[in-house]
């Protein structure tokens, strides 16, 4: 793809069609900083964002996850060494997925994390889009597995890590 003005709508329509064809398109979000911003569900009940920032030749795929209050409570009771090891493990493991990430940490306790990856104009295909969506999701899932491993698996549905409505909220 070549992100020129005349092709903006074609790129937007192609990406939307690919997402809809695979049953993951949820809605178009209002975003003044983007040519388009789609909210998707991949897999079911996991909210992610597909965004083309204005003036950029890139599509950004992202997923924000809020850590469950029960996990935060368990982390608060952990030793400083356990907290530091957990944060180190999260960072080193996310790096293995070759994604970008931002950890929101307060007093050595993970509160939220955002995982993103980019597809540039010369690599935008349906295949690249879905491989990137899957990689971002698997990186997010890996963080949940690390949380469960280090601080206990929360079995009831209300207390597992959950998504904000959008990574930009």
List the predicted regions and their residue ranges.
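Glycine-rich, often proline-containing surface loops adjacent to acidic residues and nearby aromatics
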Residues: 57-61, 108-121
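Short, highly charged C-terminal tails/helix-capping segments
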Residues: 148-169
């Amino acid at each position: 793809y070549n992100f020129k003005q005349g092709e903006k709508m074609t790129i937007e329509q192609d990406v939307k069609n690919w997402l809809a064809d695979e049953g993951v398109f949820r809605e178009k979000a209002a975003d003044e900083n983007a040519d388009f911003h789609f909210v998707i569900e991949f897999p079911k009940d996991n909210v992610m964002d597909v965004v083309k920032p204005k003036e950029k030749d890139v599509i950004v795929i992202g997923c924000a996850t809020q850590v469950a209050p029960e996990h935060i409570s368990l982390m608060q009771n952990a030793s400083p060494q356990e907290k530091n090891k957990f944060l180190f493990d999260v960072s080193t493991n996310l790096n293995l997925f070759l994604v970008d990430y931002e950890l929101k940490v307060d007093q050595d306790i993970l509160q939220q994390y955002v995982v993103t990856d980019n597809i540039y104009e010369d690599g935008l295909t349906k295949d690249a889009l879905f491989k990137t969506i899957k990689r971002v999701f698997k990186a997010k899932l890996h963080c949940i597995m690390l949380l469960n491993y280090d601080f206990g698996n929360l079995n009831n549905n209300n207390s597992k890590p959950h998504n904000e409505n959008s990574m930009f909220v």
